[in-house]
Amino acid sequence: MAVCPYGAAAVVMALLSAAIAFHCSPLLAVLQRALSLHTAHATKDMDNLFQLVRNIVPALTSKKHKGQDGRIGIVGGCQEYTGAPYFAGISALKVGADLTHVFCAREAAPVIKSYSPELIVHPVLDSSDAVEEVEKWLPRLHALVVGPGLGRDDLLLNNVRGILESTKARDIPVVIDADGLWLIAQRPALVHGYQKAVLTPNHVEFSRLWDAVLSSPMDTSNHSGSVLKLSQALGNITIVQKGEQDLISNGQQVLVCNQEGSSRRCGGQGDLLSGSLGVMAHWALRAGPEKTNGSSPLLVAAWGACTLTRECNHLAFQKYGRSTTTTDMIAEVGAAFSKLFTT
């Protein structure tokens, strides 16, 4: 299933209509019908995607025990960057995860703990035995989000490399963002072909990844083709290219998320996306392709997380305008999720 924006088609149709309306009304009627069919098809695709996301969302029931709907690990947080792992972790909880663990550097731990008593914080990421310490928890985790607030310290990056290897060995889904993507650009083999990996680069990070794995120059006029090609070059792993429209590909198809957001871009909203995607990836893989109508579960999860993040941005901007921050966006997760995915 591929969803493409149709705003450009409408503009083209308007210009063509103006040019030919006086001379050739039958042709105009044909073109207008073509646009109508295109619009109807795109709308149907969007409706289908919303339904597929709803299909993976677990029902709330008193028969479950704590932890069944998601135990998510966040790997990141250093002396300079403590907000990002908090944003990712609290977003996972707000979306519906039951527990969130944050594995961070020792100096970051007291700060992150002070932000919220709801996060379980492990000050181990800069220790000599960090990989072993995180490995102890991997059997209890459903997904990992790697990169928020990580920084580029060599010790931290080397420890994260070992954690990623252990995560793959246990077949745990992993979302990689921020400086986790810096590490991948240095060592693409860490994720090459790992079908439970999702990368979430912005424009700069995407370009860095492209240069790391592809020798040909990027076609800047064909964004969908570029994200498709980068995914293929990395062994058909799922990639979310964040931008004016979010483009999501697994090397076989491209989904476009153009849910209305706002013109406000504040630091941290990518962490909301990665945390949301961590729990949605777990839900989607647990539900399986039968719940996603044969579509890739990770594609559906990624589209859902992108749509949710944009709706949070939209709702917060309506209230706060230019002063909108990621904290304001996170406060809208409940309302946005209910509006989009609750029937």
UniProtKB/Swiss-Prot annotation:
Residue(s) carrying Phosphotyrosine: 81
Record-listed E.C. numbers: 4.2.1.93
Modified residues (N6-acetyllysine): 63
Enzyme's top EC category: lyase
Binding site for ATP: 242-246, 261-270
Ranges of residues in domain YjeF C-terminal: 49-340
Subcellular location as annotated: Mitochondrion
TM regions (residue ranges): none
Listed GO MF terms: ATP binding; ATP-dependent NAD(P)H-hydrate dehydratase activity
Cofactor dependency: Mg(2+)
Binding-site residues for (6S)-NADPHX, renumbered to this chain: 149, 202-208, 271
UniProt KW Cell membrane keyword: no
Function noted in UniProt: Catalyzes the dehydration of the S-form of NAD(P)HX at the expense of ATP, which is converted to ADP. Together with NAD(P)HX epimerase, which catalyzes the epimerization of the S- and R-forms, the enzyme allows the repair of both epimers of NAD(P)HX, a damaged form of NAD(P)H that is a result of enzymatic or heat-dependent hydration.
Family assignment from sequence similarity: Belongs to the NnrD/CARKD family.
Annotated PANTHER family: ATP-DEPENDENT (S)-NAD(P)H-HYDRATE DEHYDRATASE (PTHR12592:SF0), ATP-DEPENDENT (S)-NAD(P)H-HYDRATE DEHYDRATASE FAMILY MEMBER (PTHR12592)
Protein name: ATP-dependent (S)-NAD(P)H-hydrate dehydratase
Organism ancestry: Eukaryota, Metazoa, Chordata, Craniata, Vertebrata
